[in-house]
Amino acid sequence: MWRLTGILGRALPRLLGPGFRGITPKPTSSDGSQTTSPTLPLTRLSFDRSGSHGSKRSRDPKCCGWKDAFHWMSAHVSPNTLRDAISWGTLAVLALHLARQIHFHAPLVAGPQPAERSWHSPLYRFLSSSWWHPHSSLRRHVLPRSDCPAPRNTGLREPRQGQEDHPSAPSQCLPSDSSLRSGLLNLPEEEPSDFDFLHASRDFASQAKAAEAHPPGGKNEQDKAKALPLEEAVTSIQQLFQLSVAITFNFLGTENIKTGDYTAAFSYFQKAADRGYSKAQYNVGLCLEHGRGTPRDLSKAILFYHLAAVQGHSLAQYRYARCLLQSPGSLSDPERERAVSLLKQAADSGLTEAQAFLGVLFTKEPHLDEQRAVKYLWLAASNGDSQSRFHLGICYEKGLGAQRNLGEAVKCYQQAAAMGNEPARERLRTLFNVEAAGPSHLATTGLKSFSSPSLCSLNTLLAGASGLPHASSTGNLGLLCRSGHLGASHGAPSRTIPSLERSLVRLGFG
């Protein structure tokens, strides 16, 4: 700005000419009348345009002074020169206002900035440069005071919140006009080196804070954290691939079972079981137990049943517990309790075979519990097991775990007989014959014609008499585990093979 004022000061006297330099304003007396200064050479003024009236106007005190000087200047100065001076001055003022607006609105557009960098705006750097004199008045009036805190833009960004919190309190960051002017006039002079030192110190402080916020070990921890999800993803893909291969081998085994190639089927089951697939492990146990595609080995079958049972396979849990409980000579108490616990897990999961086995098991020592026996028999009968329905009729007829009710027993026998249960039909014929002979004969001989539920009668259930349905997602060998006509040899044909093959359509899926 001081350069602009200097240029104007040197240009205007040259434009006005030597005739205007001697003109000075008339002093005004106390009574309001104007007096002519003796140093003002009015005789040098001449107006060509005024004509004869020029002498009259020069002698009129109201027309003398600055008014005559203005008319004389406007007559001798070119209008283009005045227009250029006004235009350049206006552009300079607009440029300063524009820079000031950029100074205040740039932090709002860029978002919140740290306090130590809030004054590093374009206007601040522009006025701090070497182009401007360090002691200029424009620099003092535009740049903030060094002892004044940096203005915060939170009040501009959230005016409503500030007004709600302090509706009557005046703004503390914006001083009044008089205090601002007095403070700017008393602003101490600073050298350009001070600004450079201030910038360097603030840059160093920001770099130190950044170094504290990101220690050397933090980058390694972030790299490790990014590497962990990648390793987990790779592991998941590998596990999925292994599972897909195991499912494929198990499916090929079931297809070979349908074609009668038990050796190839057992080989595929073994490959899938080696990859930890529970359904294939269960199928290997079935082949080992019944000698299909491999010599019969009950101990190995129990081992594979146990491997599948640990993974939660309900049929494997049932077969493993059943094999243990059917060999009580070498079974210890902890193993017996473990077998019963696995049976309960399978029965609670809805497996009908486990429910029927527990219903009979709880009618015998050392697991005698008549109420629980009736409970599990009722569950198995509700799931469509005709043998459990027949056993439930025996409990009602004898009063085992339930109140004795011959009518309810006959109803259970009829339901089991309608489902094709032959023992229920025989019991109904016996009851009808005794009833025809007389009530007294029923009381003496009726209860001696049958015995309570036993594991021997349960073997009929396991031999396939009830035809229990199997879910297609179990991946088992269908009725192979319930066929009583399967031999130990893996090459001998059997009459029951066609029905067995028809039951293998749902294998290996899920």
Curated annotation (Swiss-Prot):
InterPro entries: ISR_Activator, Sel1-like, TPR-like_helical_dom_sf. GO terms for biological process: DNA damage response; extrinsic apoptotic signaling pathway via death domain receptors; HRI-mediated signaling; positive regulation of mitophagy; response to iron ion starvation. One of its GO terms (molecular function) is protein serine/threonine kinase activator activity. Residues 24-101 form a propeptide. Residues 1-23 form a transit peptide. Residues 46-61, 155-167 have a biased composition (Basic and acidic residues). Residues 19-61, 142-185 are annotated as: Disordered. Residues 35-45 have a biased composition (Low complexity). The record marks H141, V142 as: Cleavage. SUPFAM superfamilies: HCP-like (SSF81901). TPR repeats lie at residues 213-245, 246-278, 279-313, 314-351, 352-385, 386-423, 471-499. The keyword Transit peptide applies. A motif (SIFI-degron) lies at residues 307-326. Residues 169-181 have a biased composition (Polar residues). GO terms for cellular component: cytosol; mitochondrial inner membrane; mitochondrial outer membrane; mitochondrion. The TPR repeats bind to and activate EIF2AK1/HRI. Interacts with DAP3. Protein kinase activator that acts as a key activator of the integrated stress response (ISR) following various stresses, such as iron deficiency, mitochondrial stress or mitochondrial DNA breaks. Detects impaired protein import and processing in mitochondria, activating the ISR. May also required for the induction of death receptor-mediated apoptosis through the regulation of caspase activation. Belongs to the DELE1 family. This is DAP3-binding cell death enhancer 1. The lineage of its organism: Eukaryota, Metazoa, Chordata, Craniata, Vertebrata. The gene is Dele1.
